[in-house]
A protein has these predicted regions:
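Short helix-onset patch at the extreme N-terminus, typifying the N->h transition
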Residues: 7, 47-50
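Short alpha-helix boundary/capping segments
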Residues: 1-11
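Terminal presequence/propeptide segments associated with secretion/organelle targeting
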Residues: 30, 43-46, 58-753
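Low-complexity, intrinsically disordered segments with a bias for serine/threonine
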Residues: 14, 25-28, 49
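Bacterial N-terminal signal peptides
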Residues: 49-57
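Short, Lys/Arg-enriched N-terminal segments with co-localized hydrophobic residues
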Residues: 22-41
């Protein structure tokens, strides 16, 4: 059973993280992944990211620390060379040269091209949704794995799957701030959103481009990221769960690790090379570059680097925010997630079809629950809150030491402190109100009704997420429900969410929701709705507001009844966000000046944009134990039980016992490596990030961290922070010896015996 005790670190987790939504003009600060928006739908406030400005003293920056922007590579050249980089450091800042031109995003995971035929390498857990979507009790690809022997055998990925190829990154700070400098509140928010919309609209005049504007350093900088959006994504190869998820929840975030967390997609385009939806006549995409596979792997002490799209870090948050999260919000979130996971287990027990339908949801719940538990334990271990308080005290003292600085920044600091206190006071109530989103059909009804309302406006005036550019995502999101929904289970989970919401005092609850639900039972909702039928649900995408108001569907009626209240709350939040954004930008100006006064360079918090990080292969000492940097194939046999989470394929066990490793033996180990540790600095969203050696060659995939180190989202500590990578030699050996993926190996330029 899951528990919420800090010491209990159970459940599976990975580094998957949906990238920040494009509707934010501030840095992403909401720490709730999109998959949990139905569990914790907190206020859509820019405060969360805006107030993250004070901690992480630049004097504490370590050599391995940093999720660096490509534009910062010039100033890091000497450090990179000293660390062991053999490439020209300038290549790491050039989107038109490898390795960066081979790096791709999946929207929530990172990836990279490994062949000229659009073959994309990522983590096994990043393709779990596609495995689940294509699985059935008769063809259980989640359990047994999948290999397409030919291009024609490749399966469509889950609806909404994308491969994004980055084409341009440009500084648009002046354009974003035009007309906003003297504004505050809602006026400032609206101006920033209008500027953002105009920039994106201009960028997306090129067909099949997906553009967004992200804030860095608290809004001191804004950069536009332009990507080619590839819409036809197909599943090529995923090893069995006994490889890709070997060790499951028990081994998750743990070392030693023996998980082969890797899989392959392929990107397809129309015959003329343009991006197009799935069609039989489509052809493999030809990337500008792809990563070469290293002939030799890495060894202890080697320089490595990782490029990807880290989702969110909180290192620039204030000490008071850290205290609130670790003492109040995180304990509540972990308890709710633990109960949620237990409930899904209970409701799907003995029902294979239901278990398949909820597999991806459960994996995500387990992911986030364990991470929160690890963050709390890690914060205690390194005295995170106390360290942040001490660091922040130095920053504040620096401001007060100079009357000019006090006059310039003092008022903004005080305003930010006030806004943080207000936000913290409401955060737990926000989380409980968010529990109403546990029901998928209620969530679908709300989205559909919002879509209808937004469609009545000119496209440029619609809320981001509901514009014409978002139609495909909206459509595919509605389609995906079909494979992830069982009515009785949805009803039970929604009932649990409503029960938790009702623990709030009346003045904290939604008056509109309570009024509508009075005297109604949930069974009547599911008996009378047609939203569980995909075809019927999709019809609502084209209906008007009047159609919704005339509907007799109870979920639609509830969405209509609560809409005005939700919009009024959103309007207040937008006004507040504009105020926060102005204060935070000024404070961040001070923060950057403070760093410069110490001769230090800062990097911005992760926000889903392209970053690179570097470090070395190394183990560590933990509580009297020494962690060596590599695990080996023999460890798989030692852990193998033939059941549950430790059920490796029979063929793999036979090959290991026979020591049939071919040319994939690491000379210094005398055997086949499986996973390895490093000091590179990553977080959620880096799942699937290619690991490169000093020459820019592919040597593996980052897929996890150690439980002691997940606190690095808030503070990097080189003593405890370690990233776990699957070794390319284990990947290639599994493909060749276990699954017979010779055609893929040949495509990647790997010669088999």
């Amino acid at each position: 059973m899951r528990t919420a005790a800090k010491a209990t670190i159970s459940l599976r987790a990975r580094l998957i993280y949906p990238t920040p939504s494009n509707d934010s003009v501030a840095e992403r600060g909401d720490t709730i992944p999109k998959i949990f928006k139905g569990l914790f739908i907190m206020k859509k406030s820019l405060l969360a990211g805006a107030s993250a400005l004070l901690a992480c003293s630049p004097a504490m920056l370590m050599a391995e620390e940093g999720m660096w922007l490509p534009s910062q590579t010039g100033s890091l050249a000497a450090d990179l060379k000293a660390a062991g980089l053999e490439l020209d450091p300038a290549t790491l800042g050039d989107l038109n040269r490898p390795p960066l031109t081979a790096i791709a995003s999946l929207g929530g995971c990172s990836a990279a091209f490994l062949s000229p035929q659009g073959l994309v390498a990522t983590n096994h857990h990043c393709v779990a949704g596609s495995l689940q979507y294509n699985s059935s009790p008769e063809n259980d690809y989640l359990t047994n794995g999948f290999l397409a022997k030919t291009l024609g055998d490749e399966l469509p990925a889950a609806p909404g799957s994308r491969v994004y190829v980055i084409e341009d990154l440009r500084n648009v700070t002046a354009a974003m701030l035009k007309g906003a400098d003297k504004l505050d509140g809602r006026a400032r928010y609206d101006r920033l959103q209008a500027n953002r919309t105009a920039l994106i609209e201009a960028c997306e005049k090129q067909a099949n481009r997906r553009c967004d504007v992200r804030a860095y350093f608290g809004g001191q900088q804004y950069w536009l990221q332009q990507q080619l959006e590839i819409k036809d994504v197909r599943l090529v190869y995923a090893p069995a769960a006994g490889v890709g998820n070997f060790g499951g929840e028990k081994d998750n975030w743990m070392w030693p690790r023996h998980t082969g967390d890797f899989s392959f997609y392929r990107a397809y385009v129309a015959p003329d090379g343009s991006s197009a939806p799935f069609a039989k006549e489509n052809v493999p995409f030809k990337p500008k570059a792809w990563l070469p596979i290293a002939k030799d792997g890495v060894k202890d002490g080697d320089f490595i680097m990782v490029a990807g799209f880290p989702g969110t870090t909180e290192r620039l948050r204030t000490a008071e925010e850290a205290r609130f999260y670790y003492e109040e919000l995180y304990p509540y979130q972990q308890r709710m997630l633990a109960e949620y996971g237990d409930r899904i287990d209970e409701l799907t027990a003995g029902n294979q079809a239901a278990a398949i339908a909820y597999a991806a949801t459960l994996q995500g719940v387990e992911n986030y629950e364990k991470k929160i538990a690890g963050q709390m334990a890690g914060a205690d271990a390194i005295s995170l809150v106390e360290k942040k308080q001490a660091e922040e005290a130095g920053f504040r003292a620096w401001i007060k030491a100079d009357p000019k600085r006090e006059a310039q920044y003092g008022a903004a600091l005080a305003e930010l402190d006030r806004l943080i206190a207000e936000s913290n006071a409401e955060a737990l109530a926000d989380a409980k109100r968010g529990m109403l989103g546990r029901g998928q059909l209620y969530g679908a009804a709300r989205q559909l009704y919002r879509w209808a309302n937004e469609q009545a406006k000119p496209d440029k005036d619609r809320e981001p997420g509901y514009q014409e550019r978002d139609r495909a995502f909206m459509t595919q999101g509605m389609q995906r429900i079909e494979r992830r929904y069982v009515a009785e289970i949805d009803k039970a989970l929604w009932a649990d969410g409503i029960a938790e919401y009702r623990t709030l005092p009346a003045d904290k609850r939604s008056a509109a929701f309570d009024a509508f639900m009075e005297g109604r039972d949930l069974a009547s909702f599911y008996a009378a709705t047609e939203l569980g039928n995909t075809a019927k649900r999709m019809e609502w995408m084209g209906k008007s507001v009047a159609d919704f108001k005339a509907s007799s569907d109870p979920f639609i009626q509830l969405a209509v009844a609560t809409y005005d209240e939700a919009m009024a709350n959103e309007a207040k939040e937008k006004a507040r966000s504009g105020t926060v954004q102005k204060a935070r930008s000024k404070v961040m100006e001070a923060r950057l000046a403070y760093a410069a006064s110490q001769g230090k360079q800062m990097y911005p918090d992760a926000n889903g944009s392209l970053r690179f990080t570097y470090g070395k292969v190394t183990g560590k000492a933990v509580d009297g134990q020494v962690w060596t940097p590599f695990t080996t194939a023999e460890g798989i046999v030692a852990k193998h039980t033939g059941r549950g989470e430790f059920d490796a394929p029979d063929k793999m066990i036979e090959l290991i016992k026979a020591k049939d490793y071919g040319r994939y033996v690491a000379p210094e180990l005398g055997t086949l490596p499986v996973d390895f540790l490093s000091t590179v600095d990553i977080t959620n969203g880096n799942s699937g990030s290619s690991t490169l050696n000093a020459r820019g060659e592919f040597v593996g995939l980052a897929f996890d961290g150690t439980i002691e180190g997940v606190v690095s989202d808030w503070m990097y500590d080189p003593k405890i922070n370690r990233t776990i990578h699957v070794d390319s030699r284990f990947m290639l050996w599994t493909m060749e010896k276990v699954d017979g993926a010779d055609a893929l190996l040949a495509e990647m330029g790997v010669k088999t015996n």
